[in-house]
Amino acid sequence: TPCHRSGLAAHEAAAQRRWLMVPLPGRDRRVEIATVEGHGGVPVDLVLDDHYFGRERVYGEADDLLRYQFFCRTIIQMLTQEDWTPDIIHLNDWHTAPLAFALRNLAWSNPVLRGVASVFTIHNLRYRGPDELNDFLSQAIYYADRITTVSPSYAREILSKEYGEGLDDLLTLRQDRLEGILNGLDYDLYNPRTDPHIAHQFDLSCVEERSRNKKALL
């Protein structure tokens, strides 16, 4: 994942770090990757590049296209240059959509990658990315092994002209690979009656405690 400012402390504290050269037009760029422990002990690689990711905001920058193309190039280098072969690559929205085609293309010359599957998740079809000449969403819909959305109903809706945002024909073509997975949360883990991470536990009998939690956050 890109190491935005919110992840700098974790990156600096990481015990495992390595450098990787990422080819760009006209020159290569060196990035530092730190492996940290994520939720449940899952290792997470943080890609540090202050020029592209050391911003106040995660999204909404004028050069977002270049930023996330660079991130995709970094992932490609990790796949081809490092001793790392995932079973599945999960892509989200236009930011990592180009990797669906890249993975399929790389598999022709790299047998190790032929068994790597891609899952592309669409959160909102209206967000197609900043470059109208390169429709990354279309590429990912066409090349991904599986396509998921945020709910079964939304998966049905985007097959229609009304909600398909011009991609309904392509989505219909690939509807056998399309599935809606309902957004949700772990009610046991995030139960406000027992959650140790909030200042004041509450349930339906004392909902007013929520206001005290808001004050504690301030």
What does each model-found stretch correspond to?
Residues 1-218:
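Catalytic cores of nucleotide-sugar-dependent glycosyltransferases that transfer UDP/GDP/TDP-activated
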